[in-house]
Amino acid sequence: MSMILAVAISSCDRAEEPLLTDADPSSAKTTAEATKTFDDVAVMTEEAVIQYIENPEYDTYTFGECVTLIVDSVNTKITFDLGNAGCTGLDGITRKGKIIADYNGMPREAGSTLSITLENFSVDGYRVSGNFTYNAIAENASGDLELAYSVSDGEYIEPDGDVLTFSCFRTFTWTAGMASENLYDDVFTTSGGFTAGLNGDIYTGETKEEIVLASTCWADGIYYPTSGTWELIFPDGIYRAIDYGSGDCDKTVVVTIGGRDYTYQLP
């Protein structure tokens, strides 16, 4: 159910950059939180649609056990209603509002499509909106399924009113677990980019190192990538990056600003 672009910064040698003691890492941290929140919507909704199709009586969704389903079987549309009070999910996060999934075919099968919209949706007090697509395209030359993931008109609104705007287009490649019926033995790699805006700055991000998601972590309520790096390109030209580590199921990221690293535990 994470989701980017131009100025030749990637060749910079971080070891030679000065430490920028007055640089603010909060924008990169907010980007990590927002990207994860948008990715959660896609990944959790895909997971929930699969679980419903396989067993309409299923009731232990990642969103939380208090979710109400409104099913339009004619138009293959499912509304996951989390209510005004909200549901606390398996990850300990409270979500409110509605997630509306419009699907064609079984998700994760080549040719299937999944479109997602949100209605009065929030995550632990952060309002989230946007239009999502998560479509299974075809198997590549290695036999791995590739999926096209996009977010348009995304907004991530903090409780204090600050707004991060967001759009992205990324490719997910299903590299392990395709032959299994188990939802929690899958591995996906993702590459691509995003464009975001925060506090008047328009910036982009690109995957510097392929970002890896392992569904074994999802069973423990951890939906963050296990490894990989985003490189962020801001108007000020200062090198920024978000590093998800080397494979552990955790919520730790290292944000780099110029030549200084900041370690954060994300929500």
Residue spans of the language-model regions?
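Sec-dependent signal peptide recognition
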Residues: 1-3
